[in-house]
Each structure stands twice: as C-alpha cells, then as structure tokens.
C-alpha cells in the first residue's frame, strides 16, 4: 500500500522527503497483485478497494489455472471495482513441475487433470505450451490482458503467443 501511495505522490510531482520533484510529475501506471484463488472474495474485494483508493489502476493476478475461477474473480471483484485485469498464465513444464508447484506455492491450485495431461504427454514441454496457449485464448475473453510467467523458459513465450493466435509485433 505504501508503494501505491508513493507512486500517486510522484504522479502529483510530490516527494515526501524533499517536497516537489525537480523534474515535475511522473506518469507511472500503478497496479496491484490479486489472487483469484482466494477463499474470501469479499475480503479480497475490500483489500483491493483500498488499493484502488491508494492509486492502483489495474490488477495483475497470481497464476490462475481454471477459466471459471478467473470469471468468478472478474465478476465478483474486479468488474465491480472497475479495475482491468491482467490474468496470470504460468507455463507448466512437466507433471513433476506442476506437482511441485502445488506442493510448495501457497495458493497454487493446478488441477489434477492438467497434471495427468502433462504426465501422459510424449513431450511435456510442448504440452505445457499448448495448455498455456489455451489459457491465453480463454482468459482474453474474460480479462483485459494476460501476463505470462515462463520461469527459466522465457524464450518459449513467442511460441505460446503464436499457438494462442496472437501476432507478435516487431519492435
């Protein structure tokens, strides 16, 4: 919350230490993290409402593995707050990777059907890329965007986007 207040102050050209920013106001676009798998969406909505009041202008979710969870989060939390959502898509590299995440990452909820799908795949990484691409396509109908988490496999992001039908624009 303090960081959101600080960004809002910078956007007003204010510096709590020295007064005014010497180069004028910034134009930072602050967001807030949200966990769509949270058990208490009403509590989450209250926390995110305070973050919005502090200056959050969008939400970026933790990894979400099921479209119905994202849809419920958007309908019950994000949409009533008027905050756009970037849905978190995580590249699962293998069944072992998915099981590990379920075991050690708080709030992670990778369905057993996806673990089995990865386990039965002849090429688990290719299957993980397909799963991520399916999620991107699905989530873009529910949220305003996605953010991809491809830990130690960032070079696979173009492949995910290509399979999802998203054209890359050269920079």
Question: What are the residue ranges of the model-derived segments?
Answer:
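Active-site pocket-lining/capping segments in soluble small-molecule metabolic enzymes
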Residues: 1-23, 33-38, 78-131, 135, ...
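Active-site glycine-rich loop that binds ribose-phosphate moieties when present
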Residues: 15-19, 39-54
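Catalytic cores of alpha/beta
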Residues: 42-48, 71-75, 95-99, 138-139, ...
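Conserved, mostly hydrophobic/aromatic
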Residues: 51, 55, 87, 146
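Structural motif
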Residues: 54, 80, 141-142
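Catalytic beta/alpha-barrel core
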Residues: 57-66, 147-150
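Substrate-binding cleft of secreted/luminal carbohydrate-active enzymes
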Residues: 133-140, 145-149, 154
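C-terminal/domain-terminus segments
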Residues: 148-171
